[in-house]
Amino acid sequence: MSFLTNFLLGLGLSMDAFAVSMSSSTTIRPFHQKDALKLAVFFGGFQAFMPVLGWLGGSAVSGFVSNYASWIAFGLLTFIGGKMIYEALYGDPDGKINSLNYSVLLMLAIATSIDALAVGISFAFLNTPILEPVIIIGCVTFVMSFCGAVLGHRIGHFFEHEVEIIGGLILIGIGGKILAEHLLWI
């Protein structure tokens, strides 16, 4: 595959991570560059790791991916989005919410990288070398997630709790999109 093809693949796979980074960063106060870096490392790392996992597993995990992964992603994103909405409505009135603990980051990273797992499986079926696409996918996702986190914080700073609610709705919407795509392909 060409560099351009791998870059466009990375860009497509990074869109969910970009949106989730943007949504997540609206709730972090005080926000520091290390928070954006933490999001970028988790999302970029998982987007790079999951195709390798899919490539190594090949057809052994294809049944699981096609049958359950979309439901898992939907459940995780809906849970986290609902939690964000709840915290925006009933949380700390000072707005000091830190949802960047490692368990939440892990759930978000897994939920947004399930498509990358499926890409890795398709690479195995097509006998495609994995190293170059994985590096490009991980780097593109890292940059997109970092930019999404910084942008989300700047928007969130102006709109406070309304953006937290919108961010939660975006996460639920992404989960719904993943599930709808799965159900339409059955």
From Swiss-Prot:
UniProt-annotated location(s): Cell membrane
Keywords, in A-Z order: Cell membrane, Ion transport, Manganese, Membrane, Transmembrane, Transmembrane helix, Transport
Main location: membrane
Keyword field contains Transport: yes
Membrane-protein topology: Multi-pass membrane protein
CC terms in the record's Gene Ontology section: plasma membrane
One MF term in the entry's GO annotations: manganese ion transmembrane transporter activity
InterPro entries on file: Mntp/YtaF (IPR003810), Put_MntP (IPR022929)
Transmembrane feature ranges: 1-21, 41-61, 71-91, 105-125, 130-150, 165-185
Family matches, as Pfam families: Mntp
HAMAP family in alphabetical order: MntP_pump (MF_01521)
Task of the protein: Probably functions as a manganese efflux pump.
Similarity annotation: Belongs to the MntP (TC 9.B.29) family.
Protein name according to UniProt: Putative manganese efflux pump MntP
Gene: mntP
